[in-house]
Amino acid sequence: IDVTIVGHLGSAAYIGAIAVGGMLFNIIYWIFGFLRMGTSGMTSQAYGRHDLNEVTRLLLRSVGVGLFIAFTLLALQYPIERIAFTFIQTTEEVEHLASLYFYICIWGAPAVLGLYSFAGWYIGMQNSRFPMYIAITQNIVNIAVSLLLVYGLGMKIEGVAIGTLTAQYAGLCLLYTSPSPRDYAASR
């Protein structure tokens, strides 16, 4: 979404910046994919045993670990960005734009890692629809907010970064409408 929007801004530097920024977040978040995968497996086992107390504990543990990691990433954002750019060779303009994108999008880490935990938990609870609804909502919000900020307000790279950040938290807010462990207990 971000590349598509900045691709019309008239400079290849914007596309390069989104590519570099996206790559950094793909690496960072891929490392913590265990929050989703590990949570889904253990939750599925506990749910199959009808152990709803363990199901709830698994969700709380996973979210707690995810938030700890997210706040650590926020605290270490400057060294992470500096170290990353010692390995990534770009032009000064692309590095500057990618840094702007990084420093805005890193604030989405609590939402992203929290959603990893919830997605794994929902999949383990045999509910893959809700994570899909969250992903669809995030994409719609990202497109709408990014278009508004970039083309409506002329914010360029900052606009797509804020659009991405807004979409991440919109997905997290959607959790307030989601089934809780008590809802699953009532259905059994």
Report the location of each language-model feature.
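Interfacial/gating helices of multi-pass transporter permease domains
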Residues: 6-26, 93-97, 157-158
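Membrane-interface helix-loop junctions in multi-pass transport and translocation proteins
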Residues: 139-172
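Hydrophobic/aromatic residues within transmembrane alpha-helices of membrane transport systems
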Residues: 2-6, 18, 43-48, 55, ...
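Membrane-embedded alpha-helical segments of multi-pass transporters/permeases
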Residues: 74-82, 143, 147, 172-176
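Short membrane-interface helical motifs at transmembrane helix boundaries
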Residues: 72-103
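Residue-level recognition of transmembrane alpha-helices
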Residues: 19-22, 66, 105, 109, ...
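Small-residue-rich hydrophobic transmembrane alpha-helices
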Residues: 15-75, 112-131
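Single conserved hydrophobic/aromatic residue that forms the stacking wall/gate
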Residues: 176-187
